[in-house]
From Swiss-Prot:
Functional summary from the UniProt entry: Binds to actin and affects the structure of the cytoskeleton. At high concentrations inhibits spontaneous rabbit actin nucleation. This strongly suggests this archaea has a profilin-regulated actin system, and actin-type genes can be identified in this organism.
Main location: cytoplasm
GO molecular function: actin binding
Subcellular localization, as worded in the UniProt entry: Cytoplasm, Cytoskeleton
Name this polypeptide is given: Heimdall profilin
Gene Ontology CC annotation, any one: cytoskeleton
Keyword Cytoplasm: yes
Organism: Heimdallarchaeota archaeon (strain LC_2)
Disulfide linkage: none
Length: 121
């Protein structure tokens, strides 16, 4: 199944609410949903920093649960969902998504990582 097919499935199932496929230079090559005031480049920039400081997006603070160069998992302790990211293995970029609180952060990461693995250059 293609990236687009699996991404549509993840959106339809409620695993992803908003998502962006970003190049390493922060060009948006794919997106789904919208989030007023959210800037995916800010998320990517914060992810790449070595500090484990919270990420604030559109006025919501997300606490970092785990962060490596390949993985970002953060959650809003007020129950406003998660910001999750995975570096693509076959494409020089990143998949960054907001996932609802009904999906656990680690399950959300698993979904996003599987999608990121489907992205082809």
């Amino acid at each position: 199944m293609s990236f687009n097919d699996k991404a549509a499935e993840a959106v339809a199932s409620g695993d992803i609410g908003v998502g962006w496929l970003l190049s390493d230079q922060c060009e948006v090559f794919w997106n789904v949903g919208s989030w007023e005031g959210a800037n995916p480049c800010e998320i990517l920039t914060e992810w790449k920093k070595s500090a484990m400081t919270p990420i604030t997006i559109a006025g919501l603070k997300f606490t970092i649960i785990g962060k490596t160069p390949e993985r970002l998992v953060s959650t809003n302790i007020g129950g406003q969902g998660h910001i999750v990211g995975a570096k693509c293995t076959n494409y020089p970029g990143y998949l960054v998504c907001w996932c609802p609180a009904t999906v656990g952060p680690n399950i959300a990461y698993s979904v996003i990582q599987k999608l990121a693995d489907l992205v082809k250059a």
